[in-house]
Amino acid sequence: MPASKKYAAVTGAGSGIGQAAAVALAKAGFTVALIGRRAEPLLETKETIGRADGEALVVQADVANAASVEQAFAKIADAFGRLDVLFNNAGRNAGAVPLEDYEVDFWNDVVATNLTGVFLCARSAYRLMKAQTPQGGRIINNGSISAHSPRPHTIAYSATKHAVTGITRSIALDGRAFNIACSQIDIGNAATSLTERMNRGVMQADGSMAPEARMDVTHVANAVVHMADLPLEANILNMTIMATAMPFVGRG
C-alpha cells in the first residue's frame, strides 16, 4: 500500500453537506467510503467522484443501528486496510415543536440518529484507528450552530448537538494516547435541500418568521478538507463556519 494513500469515510454521503464533503475529500486525494441508508444517492455521489477521477466505495448502513455500523466499518477495513479520517456527518432535522407537544417516540428518533449514530460511528472508527499500523487517525463530528445557541422549539435537535460536543471532547482526550485526533465543525446555514425553507422564512428568537442568508455548501466541504488534511500533530478542536449575514451571534 503506497504511503501517500489516504482513506476517509463520510456518513450521510448521499446528499447535502455529506455529499459535498465526500466529493471534496476525493478531489483532495482521499479514497472515500460513502455511508448512508439508501444506495441510489450514494451511487450518484460515487459517479460524481468518478467523473473527477476519484475513488469511492458505497457502504449501505443505518448509523442508528449498532450491528449495521459494525458491518459497515468491517467492510471499510476489508476494502481499505485502514481509515485515516471519519467525517461523522449523518443527522436529521427535527423542525420546530413546542416542548409541551413533544412525543417520546419523536425525541427518541432524533436522539437515535443525531447522538447514538454519532457515537456508534465514532466507536467503530476509533477501534479501527487504534488497531491499525501506523496507529491513529482523525474523527470530525458535524455539530451545529445549535451546539452553542438553540433555535426556538428545537429541544431535541439542540440537546443532541450539545451532546455531540461532549463526544468530541471526550474522544479528543481519550484518543491522545493512540494518535487519534477528534474535531467538531459547527455549521450555520449551508445551502442544501434541507435549508431551502430559510429562503421563505424560519422562526427567530422573538417568535417572528424571517428569511435567513445561506452560504454555498462548498465552503463547508473545503473546511472539512482543511481539517482532514492536517498532520496528526495538529488539531482544530472546534470550527464554526456560517453564512456571514445569518442571525447567530447574539441571537440567544
Regions found by a protein language model. Give the residues of each.
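C-terminal helical subdomain
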Residues: 184-185, 203-249
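Active-site helix of classical SDR
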Residues: 122, 160
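Conserved glycine-rich Rossmann-like NAD(P)H-binding loop of the short-chain dehydrogenase/reductase
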Residues: 30-44
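Conserved glycine-rich cofactor-binding loop
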Residues: 14-16
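Substrate-binding pocket helix/loop in short-chain dehydrogenase/reductase
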Residues: 97-99, 106-108
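The beta1-alpha1 cofactor-binding region of Rossmann-like NAD(H)/NADP(H)-dependent oxidoreductases
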Residues: 40, 60-72, 104
